[in-house]
Regions:
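Short, well-ordered surface patches within globular domains
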Residues: 63-173, 209, 215, 219
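N-terminal low-complexity, Pro/Thr/Ser-rich intrinsically disordered segments
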Residues: 30-71
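Bacterial N-terminal signal peptides that target proteins for export
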Residues: 1-10
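A well-ordered secondary-structure block
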Residues: 140-245
């Protein structure tokens, strides 16, 4: 018997951000995040690669069903999971200097300002290293299905244009014990997507951060589309524990 628990749902709008967060227990959780600022590809601009064992962390680089950016997303999540403190030091802490009140980088009105960045840094510095996420074709197909169909519309959120949920999409391609989904709108690099979800501005439960740092998740899939009618792009990230492709 499947057990579903609906937890707190939050929808917060500001100039450049849209966040929604909810949880389901099968055991399951999923969350969304959007940020329009972006960086270059993590691989194209990774001057600190000497600090990471890229060959170990880049678990998706040789698969043939993900784009370069989609592979970058998995690499960045594995960096964050393998050494949370170092990830915070290199990629999250530097954002602190770019705040003026609640305005980030002279252009983005945030919900919480510098406080949420400090909160994220503190969390990451206390977090224990986690096992790496491995790519899964079925999870990626589920993510790509949602990103491609939603990208052709102005819709946001986890409900598919056909009414599907993250879990029905994942079940279409595989079996799992736990599963989750994150969505980012407007971002154009793997690192930008992952850092924004970890910071989780405006979401009291930090559900997006928890998905990335969930010790139960061992597999991940990514779907990225440049065609969203409102935000320009949409990136869907799926997660699962005890997952197997059908």
């Amino acid at each position: 018997m499947k057990k579903f628990i609906i937890a707190k749902f939050a929808l917060i709008l500001s100039v450049f951000f849209l966040f929604s967060c909810a949880t389901l227990d099968k055991l399951n959780s999923f969350s969304t995040s959007m940020n329009k600022k972006s960086e270059e590809s993590a691989l194209q601009k990774n001057k600190d690669s000497d600090k990471w064992d890229i060959a170990l962390l880049d678990t998706a680089r040789n698969v043939d069903y993900l784009s370069t950016l989609e592979k970058d997303v998995i690499l960045e999540m594995n960096k964050a999971r393998s050494n949370p403190s170092l990830y915070a030091e290199l990629y999250i802490s530097p954002r602190i200097k770019k705040f003026d009140g609640k305005i980030y980088n002279n252009s983005i009105m945030t919900n919480e300002g510098i406080a949420v960045v400090n909160d994220c840094v503190a969390y990451m510095k206390k977090a224990k290293p986690l096992s790496l996420l491995n790519p899964a074709k079925g999870l990626s197909l589920a993510a790509q299905e949602h990103s491609s169909t939603q990208g052709e519309t102005d819709q946001t959120g986890h409900t598919g244009v056909d009414g599907s949920s993250p879990f029905t999409r994942i079940e279409k391609y595989g079996t799992f014990r736990t599963a989750g989904e994150n969505i980012a709108y407007g971002a154009k690099s793997g690192r930008d997507i992952v850092v924004d979800l970890l910071i989780d501005d405006g979401v009291p439960g930090r559900g997006h951060r928890k998905n990335i740092m969930n010790k139960e998740f061992a597999s991940s899939g990514v779907g990225y589309s440049k065609k969203h009618k409102v935000y320009g792009s949409v990136c869907v990230i799926t997660y699962a524990g005890s997952y197997a492709d059908k």
